[in-house]
From Swiss-Prot:
Classification lineage: Bacteria, Pseudomonadati, Pseudomonadota, Betaproteobacteria, Neisseriales
Function per UniProt: Catalyzes the NADPH-dependent reduction of N-acetyl-5-glutamyl phosphate to yield N-acetyl-L-glutamate 5-semialdehyde.
Keyword Cytoplasm: yes
Pfam families: Semialdhyde_dh, Semialdhyde_dhC_1
GO molecular function, one term: NAD binding
Protein name: N-acetyl-gamma-glutamyl-phosphate reductase
GO cellular component, one term: cytoplasm
Reaction catalysed by this enzyme: N-acetyl-L-glutamate 5-semialdehyde + phosphate + NADP(+) = N-acetyl-L-glutamyl 5-phosphate + NADPH + H(+)
Active-site residues per Swiss-Prot or TrEMBL entry: 152
Subcellular location: Cytoplasm
InterPro entries attached to this UniProt entry: AGPR_AS, AGPR_type-1, NAD(P)-bd_dom_sf, NAGSA_dehydrogenase, Semialdehyde_DH_NAD-bd
Record key words, sorted: Amino-acid biosynthesis, Arginine biosynthesis, Cytoplasm, NADP, Oxidoreductase
Record-level GO BP terms: L-arginine biosynthetic process
Amino acid sequence: MSKKIKVGIVGATGYTGVELLRLLAAHPDVEVAAVTSRSEAGTAVADYFPSLRGVYGLAFQTPDEAGLEQCDIVFFATPNGIAMKDAPRLIEQGVRVIDLSADFRIWDIPTWEHWYGMPHAAPGLVSQAVYGLSELNREAVAQARLVANPGCYPTCVSLPLVPLLRQCRLKPGMPLIADCKSGVSGAGRKGNVGSLLCEVGDNFKAYGIAGHRHLPEIRQTIAGLQDGIAEGFVFTPHLAPMIRGMHATVYLHLSDGICPETILRDYYRDSLFVDILPAGSTPETRSVRGANLCRISIQQAAQSDVWVVLSVIDNLVKGAAGQAVQNMNIMFGLKETHGLGAIPLLP
């Protein structure tokens, strides 16, 4: 395209922010015009992120000084509670917004306020937001002014379930269990004891068993596709001793006489970022590292009526920044692969 899309990134000093900068640097149709950070205002992006030396000549600015209203689209890579305060003004000025936080993911306001522990600052805007699971809501994303980018766990769990739920192939009243593992980068860049090398290295643990914020998000997707399933959904996340990557093992009960692998292959036949592996395969997190990919396999457990789904993504790419860029491409009628052609890193 002749005129490049002007992009702004709010909160660009975190892991999703730098991942957006990395991906957009390879995008042929965009110009990153503004990057904001209140704490690092005045600091050159290349000084703060040495990996971007020679790539960007920008410096961080405060949101008030960055001229975000002159952008065509703004990404919010901010903590929960920021976008719902700042996005409405930009949308009123004709700027399209993709929010990578959870501010607009949950449609039911009391549910959101319960899980996120604060009053919602823009409840009237929630109904206008499109949930940006690209492979589920592509047509709605294309028309959206505001996209709520999904969380990493919801992306990894939902992508293998969507084709089966759309055909109502899960057995109602039976448990649906997602056993998930995430790299430490999912906790963000702010320092905390739980993310220290001495805490996570050579260690493995579950967390959020009493309730994780992504639970209502996943249940919302399930409930919107098939009745009688979301109530039996159980989700247990784990922290794995790796920097990036996410693995979901999902146990489910399916209708008799179907071939779920065929259902998944048919649904994702034209999807560029979902790879359905042959039955018996075991996708690895390293097979998607650095790429906007989800690799999935499904097979029946031995001597059981339980089916086992394996799903892997890079939590920072398909689980965050990559899916956000994919949604931007859809919104502006671009090829979905633009900026997202990176091959997974190995080793």
